[in-house]
Amino acid sequence: MQLDKERAGVLVGSGMGGLTVFSDGVQALIEKGHRKITPFFIPYAITNMGSALLGIDLGFMGPNYSISTACATSNYCFYAAANHIRRGEADLMIAGGTEAAIIPIGLGGFVACRALSQRNDDPKTASRPWDKERDGFVMGEGAGVLVRLRSPFVFLRSLFNELFRFVREEKKRGNEFSI
């Protein structure tokens, strides 16, 4: 069975988007002027680029957007992807989230709003979100996706072949030809 790419979508969100690209762009503006900002500044700083680039690379033409709801972003993406399948708008959805905010401006912002745990002397007990004695969260970075299918076995072979091709090709090049 062949995967119908018009019925395959991507929903990958990010709480903050391309924070490193944004930070680098602001630094270039301040130090060298607007002519030294990369032309990829806006496209790579916006939160929908995870979905957009994955959709472009896989050739998926179904629903493709991103959701940004802070720490709950991935959960909202999973729910929305399931609804696209439930409503018959897609047969396959890749859904999840990504975040990479551990850079000076990201850490500085969370320090400024006093959101980070102060338990630096005991890292094993620093992250305690449901404890009455909690004092903030511990930052992390990562990405993860789930593949939701209307019929779990119909598309698996085609999908995994496509995903493995994507991973192999990404090792060879960047995204220089997508924009």
Q: Can you say where each PLM-predicted feature lies in the sequence?
A:
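Acyl-thioester C-C bond-transforming condensing/cleaving domain
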Residues: Q2-R7, G15-V154, S158, E162-R165, ...
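Intrinsically disordered, glycine-rich low-complexity segments
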Residues: V167-N175
